[in-house]
Every structure is written in C-alpha cells, then in structure tokens.
C-alpha cells in the first residue's frame, strides 16, 4: 500500500491489517508519561488515529473524539505533538512501533494518516488510510462505523435468552 507525501508516492512499510483480523498488542508511552497496552481484548471499543502532522487534527475529528470519548478508548498517535486539543493521557508521539504493526509507517519521522476501530474482542472492524497525507478522512463513515462498533451486541447462546428470562 502507498500514500502520497508532498506529491511523492511513498510505500507504507511493514504489516497491512485486514478487517476481522486480530489487532496486535502494543505498548505505547502517552504524553502524560503513562504506558498503555493497546490493541488487545478490552472493555470498550478502541480507536487508533494516526496523524502525520501537528496540524492534522481537525475540529471535526476533535468533535467526534469528544462525543465518543466516554464510550471508547480513543488514542491519537503522531510523530509530532498535536497541541492543546488533545488529552495527554490518550495521545502519544511514540508512533514507530504502532505505525509498523498497523501498516502505516512511512519513515522514522512520519506515519500515514489513518483510522482504525478495534472491537472489544480485539479485532479490526474498520480502517481508513488516506491516499495522500493531506487528504481528509471520511468522517461520516468513521462515525457510523464507530457507533456500530460501540453498540454491537454479540449474538449466540446467552443463558438468560435461552431460559427465556
């Protein structure tokens, strides 16, 4: 897979992640100094947002993050500090390992612009990697998929349903 940086096509290095596949577990240092392990089974849906530049975080994306921050673990990962609109407990510049494992690594100074949604079972249910690092995300689709993932109810044998309770 490739992305465009300043008009030049760059090959994204390392792994390409497929929908339904298991997300890799990654330890990330957040800007507040905490280390968090992300990408595994979790009590909430997880969202990984990789942003290439300091100014990549738009007010529209920030609004979606704010709307869903209590219902999902939302992480912003970038090679550069993103500024005041971010929560240091959920933001990281420790991007290289995640970018490699998620297939969005460009080089030691840059990652592709991407969105990943991981369900509670630790599986990828949505991904978007922009064609150009300057392109906008499809935020309407992202919000729809995030809402679906948060409100997904597992089907199958549940004792209470089986007993008619």
Each model region followed by its residue ranges:
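Chalcogenol-based redox active-site neighborhoods
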Residues: 1-165
């Amino acid at each position: 897979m490739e992305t465009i940086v300043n008009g030049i096509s760059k090959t994204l290095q390392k792994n390409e992640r497929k929908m339904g596949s298991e997300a890799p577990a990654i330890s990330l240092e957040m800007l507040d100094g905490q280390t968090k392990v992300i990408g595994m089974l979790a009590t909430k849906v997880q969202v990984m947002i990789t942003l290439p530049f300091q100014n990549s975080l738009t007010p529209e994306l920030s609004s979606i993050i704010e709307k869903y921050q209590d219902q999902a673990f939302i992480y912003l990962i970038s090679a550069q500090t993103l500024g005041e609109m971010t929560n240091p407990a959920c933001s990281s510049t420790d991007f290289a390992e995640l970018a490699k494992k998620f297939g969005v690594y460009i080089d030691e100074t840059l990652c592709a612009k991407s969105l990943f949604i991981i369900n509670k079972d630790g599986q990828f249910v949505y991904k978007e990697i922009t064609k150009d690092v300057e392109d906008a995300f499809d935020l309407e689709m992202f919000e729809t998929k995030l809402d679906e993932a948060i409100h997904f109810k597992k089907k199958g044998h549940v004792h209470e349903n089986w007993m008619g309770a």
